[in-house]
Amino acid sequence: MGRRSRGRRLQQQQRPEDAEDGAEGGGKRGEAGWEGGYPEIVKENKLFEHYYQELKIVPEGEWGQFMDALREPLPATLRITGYKSHAKEILHCLKNKYFKELEDLEVDGQKVEVPQPLSWYPEELAWHTNLSRKILRKSPHLEKFHQFLVSETESGNISRQEAVSMIPPLLLNVRPHHKILDMCAAPGSKTTQLIEMLHADMNVPFPEGFVIANDVDNKRCYLLVHQAKRLSSPCIMVVNHDASSIPRLQIDVDGRKEILFYDRILCDVPCSGDGTMRKNIDVWKKWTTLNSLQLHGLQLRIATRGAEQLAEGGRMVYSTCSLNPIEDEAVIASLLEKSEGALELADVSNELPGLKWMPGITQWKVMTKDGQWFTDWDAVPHSRHTQIRPTMFPPKDPEKLQAMHLERCLRILPHHQNTGGFFVAVLVKKSSMPWNKRQPKLQGKSAETRESTQLSPADLTEGKPTDPSKLESPSFTGTGDTEIAHATEDLENNGSKKDGVCGPPPSKKMKLFGFKEDPFVFIPEDDPLFPPIEKFYALDPSFPRMNLLTRTTEGKKRQLYMVSKELRNVLLNNSEKMKVINTGIKVWCRNNSGEEFDCAFRLAQEGIYTLYPFINSRIITVSMEDVKILLTQENPFFRKLSSETYSQAKDLAKGSIVLKYEPDSANPDALQCPIVLCGWRGKASIRTFVPKNERLHYLRMMGLEVLGEKKKEGVILTNESAASTGQPDNDVTEGQRAGEPNSPDAEEANSPDVTAGCDPAGVHPPR
């Protein structure tokens, strides 16, 4: 197995953050849940204690506190999505309702700690508590709070995320115009933070920046897609590559092809994860120094690749959930040394006031798994050279070491603020990397060939094939080395010498990937599909129709998606280089009966906040009481709504509509954030097409208590809340009472186009 393949395997295996909180033992799962079968793991590891005491990463006199903290369960933390206009309303709801109910509450004799804000996270948008998932699930006193967390998490308004993992995105200092690469993104909690920062201004539907989120594990990429979809952004692309050889992309700039350099790069590399001992209990028995020794090379390759793709003046954050200097300072020191001044560590000591951290260390030793220590490379016997590398040791030259300013690195210790262990370093790029300084400018096709065939010395030194004669197999399908494949194709197309190449015949293209996703097909300007949509919704002339795409090349287009202009540029110029898993948000869905209503496509709730600024018709302004009725009843008659809403609805033809609630600043008791909903104007009624969890979110924000049971009539309210809105009758639906057994409402609800994301809140559609 080659080094690159081994690296991919290590990236997939070393994922400590996936462990369930508090999973301390194994066993068989019965009706009552996971039950015993294995002895509980003893939270002791003498080698671990010996190693870190010798390295002195913990201040003198604090070792006992450090170990005690590691043996305690990790507090639960949650983060409120900051870019959404509803963030203040959620925070108000949490502080004044749910948190107050937790005061003086005890569960199994343990006093429940009222959640407290993280002192260093801006605007009180992150909170922590001693409530574990186990307690939240089993305690009836916490049922409402648990349902709130589950529902709001699914809606994208709240994220369950470990406190220390929130730090790297904050230190990236992202602005809406930044091009961002997240190199090892799954499961996606940090990625969602980056998306939030791009959309800091909710009035701008398409910020200039974007996030390309990459992960080496194909299955985990779909977890990443699920996380990103909760935020409904047109500026996120999920790709599947080996981070250590992620392809260099190109973009079109005024008709010329130029290399894409990123303004911000998050390099949260795979690690041994000994900082996660509080939640990943297996680390106690499995920890050895061998894990760090094996991962060091991969971490350095990923960091180097990130530095190559960083724009001058850009910022890269390198982070691990490990306390080991072999994975931390050693990687940074080696990267700084090989950069020859192109990179420098930024001083971020004042950027997160309230965060407690220890400065990076400048001296460390290397220990083998059997406890043998080495202070420098010269002392390592030849038999150990495959396991221990010279880059694992600190630089010998004291002046060079001092110039690196390794003390600017941040190491977070668990006992200082009741968190996990973590390491962060912020790097700024001052100039091109030494091996990239003579990079040719790209001009047309010949320049593409030159760029693709000139690989960096980093590729050479890390044992990667750099010319076609070194490719091992005609069916090479590596998940990241697409530059090599591109170079091979160019050489073949140009008739260059190919002696010794074990490749396909010249008439065939090299296979880049093992399999392909559905294509991303942009809708051409002259497509007859768009004019009826444009007319029906009176779209603004500024609407970027060129950014619409579908996922099929044949048959009827059932879903229309949208990406930002910048991501469109990336997609069009790199379709053969990238393995794209997902991008874009759904904005329109085909309605089977749409032709009867002048437009075959209805609006999708997923993309309504992106689309709404461009829509000039089919908009009904509703009151807060109207919103309550629309979200708690399936097909309320016009007469159940306010007279203002009725007068607007009666003048509209049947079909898809936008329902807009504007807050009333004169009424402080009313909901103070705007709401935009997708709906359908039927013959005599209106219905909404809003996912269940999103419905529950809006109802909670309006002060309605929602229960979690699924009943035939849909969302169930408490008696007190139901009295304020009126319950729908249980015997027949509104559509049947209106004499519409085959109404468009019913056909729409039963249409196969109605996906889970657009389905009303778990209700049975009218038949």
Swiss-Prot record:
Changing residue 139 to E: Mimicks constitutive phosphorylation and abolishes methyltransferase activity. InterPro entries: MeTrfase_RsmB-F_NOP2_cat, MeTrfase_RsmB-F_NOP2_dom, RCMT, RCMT_NCL1, SAM-dependent_MTases_sf. One of its GO terms (biological process) is mRNA processing. Pfam families: Methyltr_RsmB-F (PF01189), Pre-PUA_NSUN2 (PF25376), PUA_NSUN2 (PF25378). The modification Phosphoserine is found at residues 139, 456, 473, 593, 724, 743, 751. The keyword RNA-binding applies. Residues 719-730 have a biased composition (Polar residues). Disulfide bonds: none annotated. Signal peptide: none annotated. It catalyses: cytidine(48) in tRNA + S-adenosyl-L-methionine = 5-methylcytidine(48) in tRNA + S-adenosyl-L-homocysteine + H(+); cytidine(49) in tRNA + S-adenosyl-L-methionine = 5-methylcytidine(49) in tRNA + S-adenosyl-L-homocysteine + H(+); cytidine(50) in tRNA + S-adenosyl-L-methionine = 5-methylcytidine(50) in tRNA + S-adenosyl-L-homocysteine + H(+); cytidine(34) in tRNA precursor + S-adenosyl-L-methionine = 5-methylcytidine(34) in tRNA precursor + S-adenosyl-L-homocysteine + H(+). It is found in: Nucleus, Nucleolus; Cytoplasm; Mitochondrion; Cytoplasm, Cytoskeleton, Spindle. Keywords: Acetylation, Cell cycle, Cell division, Cytoplasm, Cytoskeleton, Differentiation, Disease variant, Intellectual disability, Isopeptide bond, Methyltransferase, Mitochondrion, Mitosis, Nucleus, Phosphoprotein, RNA-binding, S-adenosyl-L-methionine, Secreted, Spermatogenesis, Transferase, tRNA processing, tRNA-binding, Ubl conjugation. The modification Phosphothreonine is found at residue 718. Belongs to the class I-like SAM-binding methyltransferase superfamily. RsmB/NOP family. TRM4 subfamily. This is RNA cytosine C(5)-methyltransferase NSUN2.
